[in-house]
């Protein structure tokens, strides 16, 4: 794959900056070292909070959460990190910006991580928080990477809930076939490789993943009805890219409303580049516009229906 052509100069600068903080071989280190290095990288890319935005920490359904005050419906944001790394500090500037730009309350859940807590611990935590929030009013779901997986699984767990206004999945891993499509075409993509995906999948389950568990791999479900309006975003240069389109297509085929967008030339983890890479900034604008529309019960204008 000719990434020199597909990926533009600002994105390459982001890739190099990421590699300086989180080298490609980090996945081969101990989990403790992976977390230490990841936390350092997150601090390096942290953009702070927009003016007037504050957050408070507490527990929801027994799960530690960070809450950014705002209007309802609230957004439950589930962070990425391969189910291994990340937490309340890793994505809170992203959550702060979402809150500032949409005016909505945003809640980030500090779900349990592997390998200490294999699947379904993270799913159980995310579903418990979502149910508690939904009991208080309408809700939106959003998440990137592993968090996109959790958001889709939680949507299934809440299937048909009238207060679930929509979900936005950002470069999610949804259990698509790693031996076909983007899994092969972008097996050696910058930022995330096919081997990385397989490593994190096995670690999540303390061994090979189950063959038919939609709480772990939402694309393994046999029923895609009753799911909320959905935006699923794939990064073109990412082995997970095809999962977004496959998921949106199945919702649409089941009579739901969903759209998939492939962001050209972007790589896994590009949300951290939203201030430095124009393509990433445009994608973040799309995310904000979609959350705003879903919150109002609308479909995003200018997007395919």
Residue ranges and their predicted role:
Residues 7, 56-57, 61-66, 70-305:
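Alpha/beta-hydrolase superfamily serine-hydrolase fold, recognizing
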Residues 1-67, 210, 296-305:
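A glycine/proline-hinged amphipathic helix-loop "lid/cap" segment
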């Amino acid at each position: 794959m000719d990434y020199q052509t597909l990926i533009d100069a600002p994105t390459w600068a982001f890739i190099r900056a990421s590699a300086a903080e989180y080298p490609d071989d980090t996945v081969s280190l101990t989990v403790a070292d992976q977390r230490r290095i990841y936390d350092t990288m997150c601090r390096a890319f942290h953009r702070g909070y927009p003016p007037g935005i504050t957050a408070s920490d507490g527990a929801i359904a027994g799960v530690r959460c960070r809450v950014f005050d705002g209007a309802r419906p609230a957004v439950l944001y589930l962070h990425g990190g391969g189910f291994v790394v990340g937490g309340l500090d890793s994505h809170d500037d992203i959550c702060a910006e979402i809150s500032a730009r949409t005016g909505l309350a945003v809640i980030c859940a500090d779900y349990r991580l592997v390998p200490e807590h294999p699947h379904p611990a993270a799913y159980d935590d995310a579903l418990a928080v979502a149910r508690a929030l939904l009991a208080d009013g309408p809700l939106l779901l959003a998440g990137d990477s592993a968090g996109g997986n959790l958001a889709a699984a939680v949507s299934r767990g809440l299937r048909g809930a009238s207060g679930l206004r929509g979900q936005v999945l950002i470069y999610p891993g949804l259990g698509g076939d790693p031996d076909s499509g983007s899994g092969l075409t972008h097996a050696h993509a910058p930022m995330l490789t096919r081997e990385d995906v397989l490593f994190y999948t096995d670690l999540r389950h303390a061994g090979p993943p189950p063959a038919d568990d939609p709480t772990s791999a939402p694309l393994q479900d046999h029923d895609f009805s009753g799911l909320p309006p959905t935006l699923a975003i794939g990064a073109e240069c990412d082995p997970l890219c095809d999962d977004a389109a496959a998921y949106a297509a199945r919702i649409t085929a089941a009579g739901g409303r969903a759209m998939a967008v492939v962001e050209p030339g972007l790589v896994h983890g590009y949300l951290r580049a939203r201030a430095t890479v124009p393509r990433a900034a445009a994608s973040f604008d799309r995310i904000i516009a979609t959350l705003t529309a879903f919150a109002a019960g609308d479909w995003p204008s200018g997007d395919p229906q």
